Swiss-Prot record:
It comes from Bradyrhizobium diazoefficiens (strain JCM 10833 / BCRC 13528 / IAM 13628 / NBRC 14792 / USDA 110). GO terms for cellular component: cytosol. The keyword Lipid metabolism does not apply. This is Glycine--tRNA ligase beta subunit. Pfam families: DALR_1, tRNA_synt_2f.
Amino acid sequence: MPDLLLELFSEEIPARMQAKAADDLRRMVTDKLVAEGLVYEGAKAFATPRRLALTVHGIPARQPDLKTERRGPKMGAPDAAVQGFLKATGLKSLDEAKIQRDPKGDFYIALIEKPGRDAIDVLAEILPVIIRTFPWPKSMRWGARSGKPGSLNWVRPLHAITATFGLETEEPDVVKFAVDGIEAGQTTYGHRFLAPAAINVRRFEDYEAKLLDAKVVLDPERRKDAILTDAKQLAFAQGFDLVEDQNLLDEVAGLVEWPVVLMGSFEEEFLATPAEVIRATIRNNQKCFVVSDAKTGKLANKFILVANIEATDGGKTIIAGNERVIRARLSDAKFFYETDLKTKLEDRLPKFEQIVFHEELGTQAARITRIERLAAEIAPLVGADVAKTARAAHLAKADLLTEVVGEFPEVQGLMGKYYALAQGEDASVAAACEEHYKPQGPADRVPTDPVSVAVALADKLDTLVGFWAIDEKPTGSKDPYALRRAALGVIRLIAENTLRLSLMKVAASALAGLSVKPADVQKLPGDLLTFFADRLKVQLREQGARHDLVDAVFALGGQDDLLMIVRRVDALGKFLESDDGKNLLAGTKRASNILSIEEKKDKRTFDGAPDAALYSLGEEKALAKAISEVQAEASASVAKEDFAAAMSAMAKLRPPVDAFFDKVRVNDDDPKVRENRLKLLNEIRSATRAVADFSKIQD
């Protein structure tokens, strides 16, 4: 079947827009094809700085013919309705219509046959629409046509459109259409400087190969691989290791069509500036990679740049230009750093009085005071020194007002650590200045120093409680204050440091420090706990655990010790994987279902202890005895936080429960016996609630 080749050739597309633009082009074209009945076999899109390209293969040469029925008016309807029906369906007279028998009357039915069109004609119709409605985040108009109504908007001036369609074994046809005076053809262009001449192309394989000959690597993944491989080899040859940076690699691959890797250097005196600042300076300003000494691992005074040209002088001029700019930028960074060192962190804090954190939650200064108080309260719970924790919380945000962080926000916290160490603060205090922001994502490291943990928890819990208090909660996909990330951070801090904390108590303490109070003060900690439960389900699901087990544990009530919840969920999951667990779950659910039906029927519950005198069968007596023993054993194990032992105790219920359902008829003819047996079923449900609410567990 025929293939489509489409290229949109323009001035340089911003690197950050290229990946989404390629995906949008693929999606828009293929969606339209499918909507037109042209189901394709495969599609792939590409982007370089100067072009978007798409290949769609296995497109049918022609649309299928369509046959549809359209229902018209009833027989005997007014002439106006009949004439409207004939006009709408293209029928010459009612003789061409069918009659459909219906209980409501007999109706005219038009059989409409719509012959399929050639795929190339469909493409000529849909491609201009796609180009004109392309969803660029920012676009422009240009040239003489820009002032005319309906002129094309594109991210950068669009120069040429290549569009061919045909079988692999035949000469393809040009898809004939024009957009804003730009006619589609078979001509593209190579590298702007190395091979700018026009190139005639036929289909994708021919197109990609000719572009490569014209110094254009079409596939961004190939460009990334080439940059990474060449950069590593160049660094290795000089005795260095490349400091890899995936985000920078993605960006640089969008800046070049023909990547050429070169190495430059800067003066060693700049290495006195923190390595992270040097890296941020070189990355942000010149889009260059840094390297480290292969022996010591320390940052070296070299950098790797990626040019878009094979220079006749071997790249000397390009290197010199980059060195000149980097030298100036590093000089600025060094000045910022040295200026910052002249002012102590605590001396910066008064300025926070003029900085509003949130209009309802007060200034940054007020927030720092809250975090300091809360961190000091949390410190004994996590084994941290109270004085060091309070000091760390006091200084943790101070680096936000430094020159370096103002220039490079990504090093906030890290610079706080460097400045704290420079002014002689304790190592734990300095570490907390950096680590209190962590973890900032699922792959981010979790702090282990108790002081860092205490300040990190206080920072995140103050944020969560504060925004809960003013009813600024996440909704759907909107989470402007990153509260979901903060909650996951709290969960990871607790779980990975095996901390015992009552979230309800800590949340209440955080709430007490707020000047603003919610309408229902008592409700807030519980609402926040529900939010943590939802986040914990997300966390455990990503780790392969079942989210319904989290519901089963939280349903017990009073569960706000996340570490114990995680351990209980783990033990419950292992138990339910065993035959005893599966069968006990089935028995418990059967008991719950029977109880639900009978409670609804009788409009009452069957609470209270069964009457042993009414037991007439051995299976009843055996089950009652087993429940009594298991309840005592499981409760004792839970009290000792030995959840595995509690599950083992639960397993002892399986045989008597199975026997009871095999031999005993619950709904006995004697009302008293029936009631007693239903109470015994309720005892099964109550016994299992020592570890979880089994009714919340999915089969």
